[in-house]
Amino acid sequence: MITLIWCQDKHFGIGRDNTIPWKLTEANQHFYNTTKNQTVVMGYNTFQELGDKLTDHNVVVLSKKHFEELQNNTNIKVFNSIEKLLQHHFNRDLYVIGGKQIFHHFIELADRLIISVLPVDFKCNLRLKLGLDSFELMQEQQHSQFKVQYWHKKHPERLSFNVFLEDYNGTLPNLLELLIDKKFNLHQVDIAKITTQYLHLINTNLNKQAIEPITDYLVITSRIVEQKANNLLQINDIALDSDFLDNKLRDKLVAQLVEYKRYRESLDDFEKLRINRLAYFSKDNDFNRFIQTVDKSNTEPVKIEDELPNYVSVLKLHHAMNKLMQRWRAQFLANKNISIQELSIEQVQAEILATIKQFGYHSVSLKRVLLKVNHHISLMYFITAFVALLVLINNQIIDIEQTSFDDELYICLLDSSRIEQLQETPEAMVERAVKQRQEAQELARQVAREKAIANAQKREAYLKAKYGKDYLTREQFLKLSPEERAAHVAKMKQLKLVKNDNGRDN
């Protein structure tokens, strides 16, 4: 949970000349008790003002300009971007305490606001005015010197679309349930009233963040309007069987309502996926950040990670692949079914190499390669092909060329004899993988056998040292007669008892 906490005077003032103008013990104690032992996030100026007083807090400073300056401070954590800060403190409570720019950056991410309001004017030249339309006041506590307001972010369900008809008062999703279960007649739905109420709801929340949760009601409302319009236009068409037509149109509408309900139920899951995706870390396109020198005496820069060959940067490769993807975008979107396609990078590598070989050229455009693929190109195949290209480049099997930023991407074979050797069919590749797995299992069994033999040899050496000439190996013991075995066992038991007694005496 992200909480914004600050103190302001009656005119929204929060500071004067980068300092806090009031010295109120009660207000300071409230701030300390609320944030004690918590992670507090602040900017550089706020850290300079309050940093030495936050001894019982986990201090986090967000600053790009002073990032290098504060990095050596072991008592705090410093970040130069909100994304990195949130990634490092994922699923932790954060208290944002200032200053003004930090509040503006975090207001849309905040779940709660704690505002201490002073009843007087402190002549501040730094004021904080945030839009609180997406929050609602849950509680207000009055103290002797100030009052504290607790604001919580509005839940989307509280902004649901409520319709008021002659025979029904409630939310649109509940009306949807009644229509699906055929417990409410479509002819009783007053479209004019629903449309008027929906437009009023949109106009009321037009400039607020709250508009997002209710926009999806537009689809289902338009479906009901369409159904009602079709019924009205076909009343006088005596050539059609009205009962059959009504049932057919009603069934079509019910099917659409059921599909809409499924989308509504899946929104929460997609929202969780979206939030989880925000915590992922992505690598920058700029390779300059990976350049470093070995030591001070060596001024020549050394790259930790090499660029792609022929000066084709990752950005250019991404741009070229994105252009190809846009050409197939309409084809991808036309397919409404989400299917799971099992693909391996090795399989796609083999297909790419086989396609290049079919053209008989030294180099061929990636577009022609993908167009030559025998099966249907899906989005999953396209992404796998992108990864396969990177693997082939990394293994120095192919090279890529591009004359300009917007030009086609061309693939070149580096070693034709090596390509011939690596060229495999999917069946041969599966067979090779199975063979490799069997070899790995056999190797594991061989290692286990060798380990068992080594342990047996160690045990035999230990027993020989312990019992001397009286010790017999398993093979020697099996060659004895039953009488000799019984005598040997009795002798060994006696030796064990004697050795145990000697050990206790010592």
From Swiss-Prot:
Annotated GO MF terms: dihydrofolate reductase activity
GO biological process, one term: tetrahydrofolate biosynthetic process
Protein name: Segregation and condensation protein A
CDD domains per UniProt: DHFR
InterPro entries, sorted: DHFR-like_dom_sf, DHFR_dom, ScpA
Pfam families, alphabetized: DHFR_1, SMC_ScpA
Function text: Participates in chromosomal partition during cell division. May act via the formation of a condensin-like complex containing Smc and ScpB that pull DNA away from mid-cell into both cell halves.
Keywords associated with the record: Cell cycle, Cell division, Chromosome partition, Cytoplasm
